[in-house]
């Protein structure tokens, strides 16, 4: 089956730092990034989303209004990308929209996941068919509904004689393990930038620690680090996924309750926490003479975090997906464009060995522009 189509992927992740868009050309199984964009999220909307995500009191009216507002936000992000790139709606086969996760509960007696952003609004406002709601079919099949991006990584990074691990460091860190002789593995290792960003914003007013300036003024508090490493999630077996429901400021304040640590030392310790939890899991998959770790997401721009990963993984060649020709800042947006293409052509897009689903499935729901 031959394809040569244009798709747009839309992603707003756990960091809630804005909307990423990617216009891609998909030819057979090759994905080429044509254009990309960033669209800011209004501060008031982010504040409301954070309150919902962390379980603060809300109501259905507020959630419904957020769903509506996010639908327009995502549509406007797509329209901005089209205007910037010179393409028009009629040239785009479909949009793949992840939505904004406000709660993800993949385990227990009543597993569910909720993403906001009305795809009806996106389809009608842009004039482009939109695929959304990617996670719930996988969960209906007994899976975690996450991570979904390893299937995309498998399609674009050729298998090597040694292990390739694709590490996305967004709010949460997740890995895709491409082993030459074993099935793909993939799961959330734990916090990525989420705790560092939240701590930095709380104490400096900046949304993230640019160039690790705050962390570099501090030192690792070994006692606090040892305490953080006792988090039960870290010891859970895959498949597993996590999010802001666990790793949030309430969680961090609880961990800090018995420690008198400076702002700078907390930031440095949180950076070390992310690095160690990632390295611990990556090490499990060392295979071959030249295993490589390809980093994407916002964490790839944190020089201290990248330095510590290289130091903690001396056997590994640590670099970025950008260095391999795939822009790491738009990897997830590209992935959801690819997932939309898989849905349009009724192709499987989950990996049961990654999510725990009982079978392969074509994920997502189509929202027509008509």
From Swiss-Prot:
Keywords: ATP-binding, Carbohydrate metabolism, Kinase, Nucleotide-binding, Transferase
GO biological process, alphabetically ordered: 1,6-anhydro-N-acetyl-beta-muramic acid catabolic process; amino sugar metabolic process; peptidoglycan turnover
SUPFAM superfamilies to which the protein is assigned, alphabetical: Actin-like ATPase domain (SSF53067)
Main EC class the enzyme belongs to: transferase
Positions annotated to bind ATP: 13-20
Entry-linked CDD domains: ASKHA_NBD_ANMK
Molecular function terms, GO-annotated: ATP binding; kinase activity; phosphotransferase activity, alcohol group as acceptor
Catalytic activity: 1,6-anhydro-N-acetyl-beta-muramate + ATP + H2O = N-acetyl-D-muramate 6-phosphate + ADP + H(+)
EC number from the UniProt entry: 2.7.1.170
Transmembrane regions: none
Assigned protein family: Belongs to the anhydro-N-acetylmuramic acid kinase family.
Name of the protein in question: Anhydro-N-acetylmuramic acid kinase
The gene coding this protein: anmK
């Amino acid at each position: 089956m031959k394809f040569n189509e244009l798709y747009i992927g839309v992603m707003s992740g756990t960091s809630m730092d804005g909307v990423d868009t990617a216009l891609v050309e998909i030819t057979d199984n090759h994905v080429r990034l044509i254009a990309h964009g960033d669209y800011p999220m209004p501060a008031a909307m982010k504040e409301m989303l954070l309150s919902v995500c962390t379980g603060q009191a809300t109501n259905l009216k507020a959630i419904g209004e957020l769903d509506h507002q996010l639908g327009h936000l995502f549509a406007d992000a797509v329209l901005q990308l089209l205007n910037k790139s010179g393409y028009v709606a009629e040239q785009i086969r479909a949009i793949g929209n992840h939505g904004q996760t406000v709660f993800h509960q993949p385990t227990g007696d009543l597993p569910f996941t909720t993403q906001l952003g009305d795809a009806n609004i996106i389809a009608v406002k842009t004039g482009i068919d939109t695929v959304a709601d990617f996670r719930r079919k996988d969960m209906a099949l007994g899976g975690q509904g996450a991570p979904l991006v390893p299937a995309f990584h498998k399609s674009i990074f050729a298998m090597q004689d040694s292990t390739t691990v694709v590490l996305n460091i967004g709010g949460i860190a997740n890995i895709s393990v491409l082993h030459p002789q074993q099935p793909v593995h993939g799961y959330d290792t734990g916090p990525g930038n989420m705790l560092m960003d939240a701590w930095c914003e709380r104490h400096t007013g900046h949304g993230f620690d640019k160039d690790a300036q705050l962390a570099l003024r501090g030192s690792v508090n070994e006692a606090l680090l040892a305490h953080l490493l006792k988090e039960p999630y870290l010891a859970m077996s895959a498949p597993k996924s996590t999010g802001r429901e666990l790793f949030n400021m309430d969680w961090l304040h609880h961990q800090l309750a018995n420690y008198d640590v400076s702002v700078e030392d907390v930031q440095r310790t949180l950076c070390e926490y992310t690095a160690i939890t990632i390295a611990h899991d990556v090490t499990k998959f060392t295979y071959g003479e030249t295993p490589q770790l390809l980093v994407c997401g916002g964490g790839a721009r944190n020089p201290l975090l990248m330095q510590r990963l290289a130091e903690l993984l001396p056997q590994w060649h640590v670099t970025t997906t950008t260095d391999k020709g795939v822009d790491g800042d738009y990897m997830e947006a590209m992935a959801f464009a690819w997932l939309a293409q898989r849905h349009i052509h009724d192709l499987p897009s989950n990996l049961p060995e990654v999510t725990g689903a009982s079978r392969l499935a074509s994920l997502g729901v189509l929202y027509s522009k008509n």
